[in-house]
């Protein structure tokens, strides 16, 4: 008996990309004041499309408050995705505040301090 042919390995990435694009538009229409200026960084979808982790950062506003508000609006957003996506299972959304940009800014500040300290040491020598 022949093995079951799996769907294209890129399909998961395509679905995740489409979810990200559609969610960007749907989130823009939310009226919750706790949601700041949100940027979606990426979406990870499970192989069975049952769950999707949506990673986001916040330019303006509180990240934790935005995460709470987005997770509360997840059902509404999932319903909006259901109307836009043409797949059998629309994943349950789980929003995760991505602190990568904050950590990168902190690292840049540390590097700048180290370089400034080193140049002072070189000038003193």
From Swiss-Prot:
One of several proteins that assist in the late maturation steps of the functional core of the 30S ribosomal subunit. Associates with free 30S ribosomal subunits (but not with 30S subunits that are part of 70S ribosomes or polysomes). Required for efficient processing of 16S rRNA. May interact with the 5'-terminal helix region of 16S rRNA. Its main location: cytoplasm. It is found in: Cytoplasm. GO terms for cellular component: cytosol. One of its GO terms (molecular function) is ribosomal small subunit binding. This is Ribosome-binding factor A. InterPro entries: KH_dom-like_a/b, RbfA, RbfA_dom_sf. GO terms for biological process: maturation of SSU-rRNA. Keywords: Cytoplasm, Ribosome biogenesis.
């Amino acid at each position: 008996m022949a093995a079951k042919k799996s769907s294209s390995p890129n399909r998961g990435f395509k679905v995740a990309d489409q979810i990200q694009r559609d969610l960007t538009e749907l989130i823009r229409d939310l009226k919750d004041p706790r949601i700041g200026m949100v940027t979606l960084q990426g979406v990870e979808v499970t192989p069975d499309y049952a769950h999707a982790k949506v990673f986001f950062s916040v330019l303006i506003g509180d990240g934790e408050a935005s995460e709470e508000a987005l997770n509360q609006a997840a059902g509404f957003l999932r319903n909006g995705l259901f109307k836009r996506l043409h797949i059998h299972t629309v994943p349950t959304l789980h929003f995760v505040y991505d602190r990568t940009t904050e950590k990168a800014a902190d690292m840049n500040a540390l590097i700048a301090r180290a370089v400034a300290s080193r140049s002072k040491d070189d000038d003193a020598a």
